[in-house]
From Swiss-Prot:
Gene3D superfamilies: 3.30.70.360, Zn peptidases (3.40.630.10)
Gene: argE
Ranges in coiled-coil conformation: none
Name of the protein this chain belongs to: Acetylornithine deacetylase
Binding site for Zn(2+) 2: D117, E150, H360
Any one GO BP annotation for this protein: L-arginine biosynthetic process
UniProt: Zn(2+) 1 binding residues: H85, D117, E174
Localization annotation: Cytoplasm
Pathway: Amino-acid biosynthesis; L-arginine biosynthesis; L-ornithine from N(2)-acetyl-L-ornithine (linear): step 1/1
The organism of origin for this protein: Yersinia pestis
Length: 389
C-alpha cells in the first residue's frame, strides 16, 4: 500500500537539511547514509523496490537504486533511468548570507546547498511520480542516487561496473537550465614529480637540479599541448580542442642550494573520442626524452581519478526524442558529469532544472520557474520510455 508523501516543498526542505558533503579532505567529508535512507523511505512508500549499495573504498558512502514496473522476479527490460548524485561540495560559511542547510524561499527562488547541484532533483522526481500506477507501466522506471560525484565519482563508477541493468535511456538531472546536453570534455589531473640531487650552488655539477629537469619536462609538455590542438578538433565545443593547464608548481628551498625536488600539477581536458589510455601514452611519449636522459628521476602520478570525455551521437534516436519533447536542440558543455560512466550502461543525456552558474556558489539557489516545466518533463519522460497503458 502506498503511503502519502510530504508536499514538494517539504521534500526539498528535508533534502537540503540533510548534510551530504563530499570532499578530498577527510575533515570535511561526510557520509551520505542519512540522505540515502531518507530517499529509500520515500521511494519505498511509493511502492518502489529499493536497493542500497555500499560503495567500496569510500568513507561510508552509498548508492541507492529504486525501481518500479519490473516483473515479480524483479526483472525488466528497457525503460528509463533517472540519475543524480546525493553529495554537495563544501561551503564557505563566511560567504553565505543564509544557512546552507535551511531551505529559504525569497524572490521566487529556493536557496540552500544542493538546491541546484543537485539534491533537489530528487524532490522533482518524487513529486512527479507520487501518483504513478505500477500496473500501467509496460517498462520499468529506475531511480539512481549516487555518492561522491563531487570528488571521485566513485558511486557512478561502481554502479556502471557492477549493474546488470540495461535501460533504454538515462537522464542525469544536473542543472542544465532544462537544455539537453549530449557531450562534454573529460578531465585528468596529474602531478609531475622530479627528484634531483641537492648540493651547494657554487658547484652545480655535483648535484642534479630538479628545476632544470622540470624546465625540460614543461618544454616537452608544451609541445604535446600544440600537438593536441593540431590533431584533435570538435567544432561543437566553444574551445574545440583538448586543453592543457599548468596549475601549480613548487620546488627548491634556497637560492644558494641546488634544487632536490620539483613538482608540477597540471590538467588536461580531452575531447570525447580521445581515450584516457591514448592520452596516457601521449604523456609518457612526450616525457620519454627526459626519463631516458635522467633515469628514475621523473614520475607521473594521478591527483584524482580520471574522467573520460562523453558524447551521445547527434543521430542517436533518443536525442531526437528528447529534442522533440523539449523543442530544444542538444548542447555540449565544458564541465564534467557522471555521464561517461552511466553511458556505459545505456544511452545518456544530461538534463535538469537550475543553472550551472549557481553550482558551487555561495547562496546557491534554483529559480522556482523551473518547478512546473520539470514536473511536466519527468511525467512526459516516464510516459514515453515506460509506456504507461
Amino acid at each position: 500500500m502506498k503511503m502519502k508523501l510530504p508536499p514538494f516543498i517539504e521534500l526539498y526542505r528535508a533534502l537540503i537539511a540533510t548534510p551530504s558533503i563530499s570532499a578530498a579532505d577527510s575533515a570535511l567529508d561526510q557520509s551520505n547514509e542519512a540522505l540515502i535512507n531518507l530517499l529509500a523511505g520515500w521511494f519505498a512508500d511509493l511502492g518502489f523496490r529499493v536497493e542500497i549499495q555500499p560503495v567500496p573504498d569510500t568513507r561510508h558512502k552509498f548508492n541507492l537504486l529504486a525501481s518500479i514496473g519490473e516483473n515479480e522476479n524483479g526483472e525488466g527490460h528497457g525503460g528509463l533511468l533517472l540519475a543524480g548524485h546525493t553529495d554537495t561540495v563544501p561551503y564557505d560559511e563566511g560567504r553565505w548570507t543564509r544557512d546552507p542547510f535551511t531551505l529559504t524561499e525569497h524572490d521566487h527562488k529556493l536557496y540552500g546547498l544542493g538546491t541546484a547541484d543537485m539534491k533537489g532533483f530528487f524532490a522533482f522526481i518524487l513529486d512527479a511520480v507520487r501518483d504513478i500506477d505500477a500496473s500501467k507501466l509496460t517498462k520499468p522506471l529506475y531511480i539512481l542516487a549516487t555518492a561522491d560525484e563531487e570528488t571521485t565519482m566513485a558511486g557512478a563508477r561502481y554502479f556502471a561496473a557492477n549493474t546488470q541493468l540495461r535501460p533504454d535511456f538515462a537522464i542525469i538531472g544536473e542543472p542544465t537550465s532544462l537544455q539537453p546536453v549530449r557531450a562534454h570534455k573529460g578531465h585528468i589531473s596529474n602531478a609531475i614529480r622530479i627528484t634531483g640531487q641537492s648540493g651547494h650552488s657554487s658547484d652545480p655539477a655535483r648535484g642534479v637540479n630538479a628545476i632544470d629537469l622540470m624546465h625540460e619536462s614543461i618544454t616537452q609538455l608544451m609541445a604535446l599541448r600544440t600537438t593536441l590542438q593540431e590533431r584533435y578538433h570538435n567544432p561543437a565545443f566553444t574551445i574545440p580542442y583538448p586543453t592543457m593547464n599548468f596549475g601549480h608548481i613548487n620546488g627548491g628551498d634556497a637560492a644558494n642550494r641546488i634544487c632536490a625536488c620539483c613538482e608540477l600539477h597540471m590538467d588536461i581536458r580531452p575531447l570525447p573520442g580521445l581515450t584516457l589510455s591514448d592520452l596516457n601514452e601521449l604523456m609518457t611519449e612526450a616525457l620519454e626524452p627526459v626519463s631516458q636522459r635522467w633515469p628514475g628521476r621523473l614520475s607521473i602520478d594521478e591527483l584524482h581519478p580520471p574522467i573520460p570525455g562523453y558524447e551521445c551521437p547527434t543521430d542517436h534516436h533518443m536525442v531526437g526524442v528528447i529534442e522533440k519533447l523539449l523543442g530544444e536542440r542538444t548542447a555540449v558543455v565544458n564541465y564534467c558529469t557522471e555521464a561517461p560512466f552511466i553511458q556505459q550502461v545505456c544511452p545518456t543525456l544530461v538534463l535538469g532544472p537550475g543553472s550551472i552558474n549557481q553550482a558551487h556558489q555561495p547562496d546557491e539557489f534554483i529559480d522556482m520557474a523551473f518547478i512546473e516545466p520539470t514536473r511536466e518533463l519527468i511525467g512526459q519522460l516516464v510516459d514515453h520510455f515506460c509506456q504507461q497503458k
